[in-house]
Regions:
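Extracytosolic ligand-binding ectodomains
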Residues: 7, 11, 16-21, 27-34, ...
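Sec-dependent signal peptide hydrophobic core
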Residues: 35-43
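N-terminal signal peptide c-region/cleavage motif recognized by signal peptidases
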Residues: 47-49
Length: 455
């Protein structure tokens, strides 16, 4: 139950959350049966709770997300994902009988200063024991200092190598900061390897050796684009266009003119906002080049297909973190859409959902959570998180020692049980979500030659 309250000092509306207590679970057997229905490793948390009812003192958990402004389509789903996780965990007994109580702060247009202020408010106003975020645009290495100063746990999905480097620089200080997915760097070599596999399977034949790379200003898109650029020659590619565009962008004419003047075999776009990418396809479709079009993350958001419509058919996109189209992922999608609506973006919601389960299970195994300032208890929680191999909605979460970011499969580890799958999907029906075409063993469909391409 969400209620709006007015802060007496600032006069602004704030969202607070009240969690209703779940029913007592009648027996340990039924309790574990209920946990198994959730899939993943939820039964582990259920077993540790040992049939407890979540009627103890609530544990405040926070999230700082872009609930308004240009990334709100994702921010709302991040909120939904944490909300659903808290409700399910509470139905399993919370954390050793204490229910989770989520609080949310808006990061709006994001950026380091805004992101840090939002997290600081969660700590100062609500004394949260953990912050479980989706992504926030920024350096990816600023919130960690607020977390370190407060001694709590932080799980985020900023997908940035900046996190890995920061934690590596001082593992003792940043003990509580975890990136729940792999760094963005892996999008680069992972994409090149994916195209190579399409060629080896005979599913795609390059028209030439040219690849156009289009990026937006910002560390995230630049890191991916540079990773592609650095490794392209290893896979026989020549970067024929490497162009940075200012975003948000709705007019792609100048960029498309360059592409049409010197048509590449592959168009690789490392920008990720769905509305911008949809406009690219709308403007590309009337006069397409014989190019495989790859986009980064954005097409996984329903808004992309809603805007691009038929022009979206054939687009290939990827995410290093998203709900798998398997038994666990499909069951999550059904629960998620039953609660938040058929058009809800469960792939975004899956991020803090998994992150919350990882933290909550580790906390239960460690004997409970720690409030701000209780570094000693939260170090025990962090130790448990580092030691876990968690099978969740997005696949396997296993943290790299000394970096505390998730391993990626198959580029970083060739064992799907030890790394989070770098998923490649393709929109084959604009009325439906993309189909998972790689990697094995998670793929559910075959690559389809886009309708604008020549066989």
């Amino acid at each position: 139950l969400f209620a709006s309250t007015r802060n007496q000092e600032t006069g602004r509306e704030e969202m607070t959350t009240t969690v209703s207590k779940p029913n007592i679970i009648p027996s340990r057997r039924n309790f574990l049966k209920g946990a198994a229905a959730l899939g993943g490793s939820a039964a582990m948390l259920a077993a540790v709770n040992d049939g407890a009812r979540a009627d103890g003192d609530p544990i405040p958990v926070g999230q700082a997300s872009p609930l308004t402004d240009f990334a709100a389509a994702d921010g709302v789903e991040f909120k939904n994902g944490l909300t659903l996780a808290c409700e399910e965990i509470n139905a399993l007994g919370g954390i050793l009988g204490r229910p989770l109580e989520p609080y949310f702060e808006d990061t709006k247009q994001m950026g380091d200063a805004t992101n840090v202020q939002a997290v600081q408010r969660l700590i100062d106003r609500h004394a949260v024991h953990a912050v479980i975020n989706g992504y926030n645009i920024g350096s990816g290495a600023a919130i960690q200092d607020v977390i370190a100063d407060s001694g709590i746990i932080y799980v985020h999905y900023d997908t940035t190598i900046g996190h890995n480097n920061l934690v590596k620089s001082d593992t003792a200080r940043y003990f509580g900061s975890f990136q729940g997915d792999p760094a963005e760097y892996w999008y680069g070599p992972g994409f090149l390897k994916f195209v190579q596999q399409l060629e080896q399977a005979g599913s795609y034949k390059r028209a030439n050796n040219k690849m156009a790379v289009i990026l937006s200003a910002g560390v995230y898109a630049a890191n991916i684009a540079n990773a592609v650029k650095e490794r392209a020659a290893d896979f026989g590619w020549e970067i024929s266009l490497f162009e940075t565009v200012n975003v948000p962008i709705s007019e792609w004419g100048p960029t498309l003119a360059k592409i049409r003047q010197d048509p590449p075999a592959v168009i690789c776009i490392t920008h990720f906002l769905p509305a911008d990418l949809a406009q690219f396809m709308v403007q590309f479709a009337p006069n397409p080049t014989n190019s495989l079009v790859y986009m980064q993350y954005g097409p996984s958001i329903p808004a992309f297909r809603e805007i691009a419509k038929d022009a979206s058919k054939g687009v290939v996109y990827a995410t290093v973190v998203g709900a798998l189209q398997d038994e666990i992922g499909t069951a999550f999608e059904q629960r998620y859409k039953a609660k938040f609506g058929e058009n809800a973006g469960h792939n975004s919601g899956a991020q803090p959902y998994d992150g919350c389960y990882v933290w909550a299970t580790a906390a239960a195994l460690a004997g409970g959570t720690g409030e701000p300032g209780n570094d000693a208890q939260n170090r025990k929680v962090a130790d448990r998180m580092r030691a876990m191999i968690w099978r969740g909605v997005a696949g396997t979460t296993r943290f790299i020692p000394g970096e505390q970011a998730a391993y990626t499969y198959p580029t970083q580890t060739n064992d799907p049980s030890l790394g989070m799958p770098h998923q490649f999907l393709q929109i084959q029906d604009p009325a439906k979500s993309g189909l998972l075409i790689a990697p094995a063993p998670y793929d559910t469909a075959k690559f389809m030659l886009p309708p604008w391409m020549k066989a």
